[in-house]
Amino acid sequence: MEQKICVIGFSGGQDSTTLAVWAKKRFKKVCLVGFDYAQKHSVELECAQKIASLLQLPYEIIPLDFLENITRSALFKNSNDLIGHSHAQNKDLPNSFVPNRNAIFITLLHSYAQKLGASNIALGVSQADFSGYPDCKEDFIKSIEHALNLGSNTAIKILTPLMFLNKAQEFQMAKDLGVLDLVIKETHTCYQGERKILHAYGYGCDKCPACQLRKKGFEEFQANKK
């Protein structure tokens, strides 16, 4: 397999955008792949498309809108659940969790990597600031990498350079990569789809768990600069 192709799971958020720039500096070819899983706000996909264009990287969207028919999450556009509560199917998880979402995403990215002859997949997951999602943890990523390679007789690596970075460290990484302004102004994190108010850390409602996590990280990043 060609060693210089990397397929990235891309949402247009802080994590995957920082990851895309990191990968662009390391691989000859980088391909961004997003997923339309009937998420609550189309702004996420719109931001991803714009960022891909700014970075001059190819971007594919895979439709997965059937997901809301087979499972439950407050992130689905037809959900009446208010974000910030426990998940209806598992009280130990937040209701923004989409069961098996990352497993499905990674499986499709693995198939796409095989089609391209790529030996690397990169994900912007982190267990330092993982919002309570078990499918962002290193043990899960290593397990699914092993299972998918066994099932396809391949040796595709799943790279997770942000795995042990918190949001403050990710802001520092974006600065070191020269894209801090891009990350602040163009990426989307807010669960409410708010793009009208630009805060110091980026656009958002300033209230949802995603905004609070990003805000806290930016404040820590700023404090560490002093």
From Swiss-Prot:
Its EC number is 6.3.4.20. Keywords: ATP-binding, Ligase, Metal-binding, Nucleotide-binding, Queuosine biosynthesis, Zinc. GO terms for biological process: queuosine biosynthetic process. Binds 1 zinc ion per subunit. It is an enzyme of class 6 (ligase). Zn(2+) binds at C190, C205, C208, C211. Its cofactor is Zn(2+). GO terms for molecular function: ATP binding; ligase activity, forming carbon-nitrogen bonds; zinc ion binding. Catalyzes the ATP-dependent conversion of 7-carboxy-7-deazaguanine (CDG) to 7-cyano-7-deazaguanine (preQ(0)). Belongs to the QueC family. This is 7-cyano-7-deazaguanine synthase. It comes from Helicobacter pylori (strain ATCC 700392 / 26695). The gene is queC.
